[in-house]
Amino acid sequence: MAITFEAYAKNNLCYKAARTMPQGSPAGIIIHSTGCDNPYLWRYVDSPEICGKNPYGTHWNVPMPIGNGGKPTKICCHAFIGKDKSGTVRAAKILPWTICCWNCGDGSKGSYNYNPAYIQIEVCEDALNDRTYFEEAFGLAADLCKRLMKNYPTIKPENIISHKEACARGYASNHGDPEHWLARFGKNMDWFRAIVAPEKQVKLTAEITVDQSKAEEVSRKLRQLGCSVKIE
């Protein structure tokens, strides 16, 4: 089942640049939050039939969207998570996953926009006091990260980070998101990484004694379950 719906920002300069990730696939994922009290996707995503119409034209399907500073900015993420026009929490994909985005800025060592390039997801903030929305939004973000890890094995749990952590590594601008939101509900990025990490695999070894006449039948059933069988 699709986790995202596509609403590509084809008019955005970042989409038009179509700079392919230099390593061929994403090295990780950055989770952002928007810093604006508006949980509805229409604020950022140009898809009126799904998100509803943006009456102000402030979505990101323009060459340079209006940034939080109120000025046109070269900016674009890969996806937004927020509410559609019915109030359902959805994920909108606005860039192909393997195109470099323009979303985390520069740090002292470079930028995770480019090299290595990270997928970057914005979670639409509300007033930061609605636990139900918080759990739905970050639950969907976790599901999306799991799907991306499956599709791109280059993404490891330790490289699913926040904008704040990307800054601390020296590869993003000085922002604190989304830790301020996570902290409101007693969570942090270690919690998020724990829920997206693949479950640890363990090896089971067992012995079973059956009547000789039933050995082949039992062996066949065990092999169907993926077990190695040795009859002695």
What name fits each language-model region?
Residues 1-114:
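N-terminal catalytic cores of peptidoglycan-degrading enzymes
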Residues 2-10, 17-23, 27, 116-119, ...:
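Basic/polar, cationic surfaces and motifs that engage anionic cell-wall
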Residues 33-35, 83, 145-153, 226:
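Sec/Tat-exported extracytoplasmic proteins
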Residues 34, 124-126, 205-209:
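Short strand-loop junctions, especially beta-strand C-caps/beta-turns
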Residues 38, 86, 128, 211-213:
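Generic "edge-of-domain/loop-turn" microfeature
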Residues 89, 155-158, 227:
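A structural micro-motif
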Residues 92-95, 161, 230-232:
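General small-molecule cofactor/ligand-binding pocket signal
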Residues 200-232:
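Solvent-exposed beta-strand motifs enriched in subsets of small alpha/beta binding domains
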